[in-house]
């Protein structure tokens, strides 16, 4: 039984190594293209039997386009290097608008700081940031935390029942009882 388990692990290891070798081979091809596209193109010209190098050949080699995706996947180029400053600013604003609101910062639109402060204040209270700040200010022992949670849960249930009773009384009063 131990022998068969050992064989299975060897087979799975061999499969793992073959996939790693394939990935290494693909990455090495990408590295060759990115690191020295001119030499790669010259090597392909020599394979065809063309040994003469003219200005047009060099211009063709220099104008070779390497796909940006290939360069990004190899980690050789950053997308921000290809964008202009205006495009970077526009994309950062769009990304900021799509991010989740943590309640710490906002974007000031239309040069209106008063509106922005109101929005920041609303977001902070929606996320209960002042309450979290108060509750996290001092250390509380685990027993005290459990007691506080139990008290808050009881208060919440009591208030729900009390509000329901008030609604019943209002309804009865409206009906004339």
Curated annotation (Swiss-Prot):
GO terms for cellular component: mitochondrial inner membrane; mitochondrial small ribosomal subunit; mitochondrion. One of its GO terms (biological process) is mitochondrial translational initiation. InterPro entries: Mitoribosomal_bS21, Ribosomal_bS21. Keywords: Mitochondrion, Ribonucleoprotein, Ribosomal protein, Transit peptide. Residues 1-17 form a transit peptide. It is found in: Mitochondrion. Pfam families: Ribosomal_S21 (PF01165). GO terms for molecular function: structural constituent of ribosome. Component of the mitochondrial small ribosomal subunit (mt-SSU). Mature yeast 74S mitochondrial ribosomes consist of a small (37S) and a large (54S) subunit. The 37S small subunit contains a 15S ribosomal RNA (15S mt-rRNA) and 34 different proteins. The 54S large subunit contains a 21S rRNA (21S mt-rRNA) and 46 different proteins. Belongs to the bacterial ribosomal protein bS21 family. Present with 1270 molecules/cell in log phase SD medium. Component of the mitochondrial ribosome (mitoribosome), a dedicated translation machinery responsible for the synthesis of mitochondrial genome-encoded proteins, including at least some of the essential transmembrane subunits of the mitochondrial respiratory chain. The mitoribosomes are attached to the mitochondrial inner membrane and translation products are cotranslationally integrated into the membrane. This is Small ribosomal subunit protein bS21m. The gene is MRP21.
């Amino acid at each position: 039984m131990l022998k068969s388990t050992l064989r299975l692990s060897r087979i799975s290891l061999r499969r793992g190594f073959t996939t790693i070798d394939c990935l290494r081979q693909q990455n090495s091809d990408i590295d060759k293209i990115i690191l020295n596209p001119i030499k790669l193109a010259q090597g392909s010209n020599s394979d065809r039997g063309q040994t003469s190098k003219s200005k047009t050949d060099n211009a063709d080699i220099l104008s070779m386009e390497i796909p940006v995706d290939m360069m990004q996947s190899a980690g050789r180029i950053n997308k921000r290097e290809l964008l202009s400053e205006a495009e970077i600013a526009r994309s950062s604003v769009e990304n900021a608008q799509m991010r989740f609101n943590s309640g710490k910062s906002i974007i000031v639109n239309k040069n209106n700081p008063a509106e922005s402060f109101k929005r920041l204040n609303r977001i902070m209270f929606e996320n209960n940031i002042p309450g979290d700040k108060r509750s996290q200010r001092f250390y509380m022992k685990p027993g005290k935390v459990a007691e506080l949670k139990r008290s808050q849960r009881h208060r919440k249930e009591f208030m729900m029942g009390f509000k329901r009773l008030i609604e019943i009384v209002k309804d009865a009063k409206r009906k004339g009882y």
